[in-house]
Amino acid sequence: YPDFVRIYGETASDDSLYAHILDAIATYERSAEVNPFTSKYDAYLEGKCQLTGQEMEGLDLFKEKGLCAECHILENDERAGRVLFTDHTYDNLGIPSNPDNPFFRVPAPHNTVGRDTMDLGLGAFLHDSTEFGKFRVPTLRNIALTAPYGHNGYFKTLEEIVHFYN
């Protein structure tokens, strides 16, 4: 708190405090500490290394037959100025309900239907049935480190989710 007062002052209102906190978090999340962009793919884009034959085949599959790049786009994001592997849209992929999801064990009133809960995604937030089941297209950055996969963690491995799409 002393550092906060030193930076933002003693007279900051509750609203301005929240705005300052939000700004500080957003700045940190944009920093190189959180987003170093140091993958082999980044080095390849910068001309600092070559991809192996197998990696090039994978990239071609990602861009073409796999259709991955339709949603996990390979162009620089306007805001980030880097490839984020997401188009920031919401899609319904039909991922099955995950019986291992800890939410199913949450008691009422937070989960009133128990194991029969369906996550309606964006549709629940917007109260719009045409948006039911839509979830944000995630980034694929460091994807090998972020298991499980799918909006609800249904897929335990990358192989499982790739097979689901195929």
Please report, for each region that a protein language model flagged, where it lies by residue.
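Short glycine/threonine-rich turn/loop motifs
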Residues: 37-164
